[in-house]
Swiss-Prot record:
Residues annotated as domain HTH araC/xylS-type: 207-305
DNA-binding recorded as keyword: yes
Protein name: HTH-type transcriptional regulator AlkR
Keyword annotations from UniProtKB, A to Z: DNA-binding, Transcription, Transcription regulation
Top-level division of the source organism's lineage: Bacteria
Signal peptide limits: none
DNA-binding region in chain numbering: 224-245, 272-295
Length: 306
């Protein structure tokens, strides 16, 4: 499995829900910060986005706005709209809702937004989410000039929202995973910075090392064995990895192992020794020491507090 595919496995995208927001005149809504990927697809009209970190963007009919890490944001009819009494649409999410929420004042100026929320594991997904911008804007996604993969993907999303069939939830999760992956691919293809964790995902050699780390964290990896995955010398691999990922191969490996350990402490019934073995530590003592250095508490105490 390639690096990007394995990292998307780690994110555990699930429980995708959607709703339609029908707007007219002066309108606004907001969404609180949450552990979720948020996608707004502008089907008609336009929308102005303001994120908690100050990022702003205006999107038009046919555009997609992706909020990868679920940052709190405010959406309105234009940048000048300072409405205080705006709707928190999170309360309207209820699985798959096809009856539109209506917002705004009486006007001939109509709009329609298809909003999707997919829950994700923010901790396991942190390398990807931290590397992505807080907002990704895909222009003209549904026009004839838009990427073909996106038009086809959105067609299937639209089709699935109109059907009530067994397996619908799972299919919709898969469709949202595809949409997210393609948006990330599109973003990486347009990156100006050749030295970032995102470009390492597509690097012909380094991506092999990342895939190996994420697929087999329990293996006793060394710089040499990771270099072998890339068919490179130890020194060349170590230098290239550091220059693009901005940390050493073994530091990256340890961070991934500890992220996985946190997930297992929260979600599994494995004991501490079993978790240590599963994430590549030869002893419970070595694992506990590394965990405590990172989180300033023992694995046992962390599990009790979770």
């Amino acid at each position: 499995m390639d690096a990007l595919s394995k990292i998307f496995d780690d994110i555990h995208l699930n429980k995708s829900e959607y709703l339609y927001v029908k707007t007219q005149g002066e309108w606004a809504f907001h969404m609180l910060a949450q552990d979720a990927l948020i996608a707004h697809i502008i089907l008609m009209g336009s929308a102005h986005f303001t994120l908690q970190d100050g990022t702003t963007q205006t999107a038009y009919s046919g555009d997609i706005v992706l909020i990868p890490s679920g940052q709190a944001h405010f959406v309105s009819n234009d940048a000048q709209n300072k409405l205080i009494d705006c709707s928190n649409i999170q309360s309207f999410f209820d699985g798959h809702r096809n009856d539109a929420i209506e917002l705004g004042t009486t006007s001939s100026d109509h709009g329609l937004i298809f909003t999707v929320r997919s829950h994700i594991d923010m901790h396991m997904g942190s390398p990807l989410l931290n590397a992505l911008p807080s907002l990704i804007h895909i222009h003209h996604a549904m026009s004839s000039t838009g990427p073909e993969w996106l038009r086809v993907g959105l067609y299937f999303v639209a089709l699935e929202t109109q059907r009530i069939q067994p397996g619908r939830d799972k299919i919709f999760d898969h469709l949202m995973s595809i949409l997210f992956i393609e948006c990330v691919r599109d973003h990486i293809a347009q990156l100006d910075d050749p030295k970032s964790w995102l470009t390492a995902l597509m690097h012909p050699e380094l991506s092999n090392a990342l895939a190996a780390i994420h697929a087999y964290p329990e293996k006793p990896w060394t710089v040499e064995s990771l270099a072998d995955q890339c068919c490179m010398s130890r020194s060349k691999f170590a230098t290239l990895f550091q220059s693009i990922v901005h940390e050493t191969p073994l530091a990256y490996l340890q961070q991934h192992r500890l992220r996985l350990a946190v997930q297992l402490l929260k979600t599994s019934q494995l004991n501490i020794q079993q978790i240590a073995n599963k994430v590549g530590y030869s002893s419970e003592t070595a694992f506990s020491q590394a965990f405590k250095r990172q989180f300033e508490q023992s694995p046992k105490h962390y599990r009790q507090q979770s």
